[in-house]
């Protein structure tokens, strides 16, 4: 089977896409996968590093309010459709799958116009702009929440859950030795989504010394964008600061408490693994859905 899968921007879209890829490869090991992402977001480095073919489209996000920027976005979208058609014709997939993010819009639209089978997946409890638009051009829509079925055509919506749940259960737990923390202490994991949060990072580092001499270890995942600002910061011996963790479920499996955003994929993993958690919902998401 030949599959094109597209997702971009944040781990909340990328990791469900990877979970689907893993399932496809598990069922049909000889399947060929082509991933289409953006030119400037985290997937452009992550996906090739995992050994998958990667093509990039230049896309911009559509503002929910009417602005001049949206004119540029539409122009960019038209160019991206043209390029997506070229990629799809060349690869000739059996199916094209979109897991969210602006990059999926030109890919799924182009695929439908070329007569390819299409499927999109909506992870969130509030449907994103891209998937609302794409629902008229796709064959089926997978949703994580029963409440979002009503937002899509009745003959297309399927309650699938979040693909990350199953993947989280299948990933092998890491060890505290590998993480470089005390194996005899409980572990607190602080991570504000795949991109991190400047405001939360700043707040945590304002009291990081209070962790000193506590009977637990702390791992702070800053996000790649913020790591340079704090990597030289002196922290207590029981605190470890890292920019990013790829196989987050492997760490979550040995975590005693997680402090995190309330993203759909993260919550699916936490629920599947039964990790105690404190949520700090992001205020910068569509319709405050976290």
Please place each PLM-identified region on the residue numbering.
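Conserved nucleotide-sugar phosphate-binding/catalytic loop shared by glycosyltransferases and other
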Residues: 3-8, 27-76, 81, 160
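Short amphipathic alpha-helix
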Residues: 13-25
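Glycosyltransferases and closely related glycan-assembly transferases
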Residues: 83-96, 103-119, 132-140
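Donor-nucleotide binding loops and adjacent catalytic segments primarily
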Residues: 41, 46, 50, 173-175, ...
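Short alpha-helical segment that forms part of, or immediately flanks, the ligand-binding pocket
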Residues: 109, 249, 267-273
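Active-site-proximal region of nucleotide-activated glycan assembly enzymes
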Residues: 42, 53, 112-173
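Acidic donor-binding loop of glycosyltransferase active sites
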Residues: 93-95, 239, 245, 253-266, ...
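Structural loop-to-beta junction motif characteristic of Rossmann-like glycosyltransferase folds
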Residues: 52, 116-117, 256-257, 274-282
């Amino acid at each position: 089977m030949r599959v094109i899968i597209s997702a971009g921007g944040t781990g909340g879209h990328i990791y469900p896409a990877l979970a689907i890829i893993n399932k496809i490869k598990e069922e049909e090991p000889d399947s060929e996968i082509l991933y289409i992402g953006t030119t400037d977001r985290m997937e452009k480095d992550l996906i090739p590093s995992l050994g998958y073919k990667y093509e990039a489209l230049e896309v911009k996000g559509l503002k929910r309010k009417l602005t001049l920027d949206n004119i540029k976005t539409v122009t960019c979208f038209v160019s991206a459709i043209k390029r997506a058609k070229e990629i799809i014709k060349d690869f000739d997939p059996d199916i094209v799958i979109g897991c969210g993010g602006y990059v999926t819009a030109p890919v799924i639209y182009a695929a439908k116009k070329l007569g390819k089978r299409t499927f999109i997946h909506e992870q969130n409890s509030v449907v994103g702009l891209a998937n609302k638009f794409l629902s008229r051009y796709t064959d089926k829509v997978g949703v994580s929440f029963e409440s979002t079925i009503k937002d899509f055509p009745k003959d297309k919506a399927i309650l699938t859950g979040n693909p990350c749940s199953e993947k989280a259960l299948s990933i092998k737990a890491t060890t505290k030795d590998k993480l470089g923390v005390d194996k005899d202490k409980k572990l607190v994991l602080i991570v504000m989504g795949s991109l991190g949060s400047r405001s939360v990072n700043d707040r945590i580092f304002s009291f990081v010394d209070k962790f000193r001499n506590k009977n637990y270890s702390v791992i702070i995942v800053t996000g790649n964008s913020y790591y340079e600002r704090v990597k030289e910061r002196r922290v207590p011996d029981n605190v470890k600061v890292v920019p990013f963790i790829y196989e987050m479920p492997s760490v979550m499996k040995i975590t005693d408490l997680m402090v995190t955003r309330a993203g759909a994929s993260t919550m699916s993993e936490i629920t599947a693994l039964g990790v105690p958690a404190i949520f700090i919902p992001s205020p910068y998401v569509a319709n405050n859905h976290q």
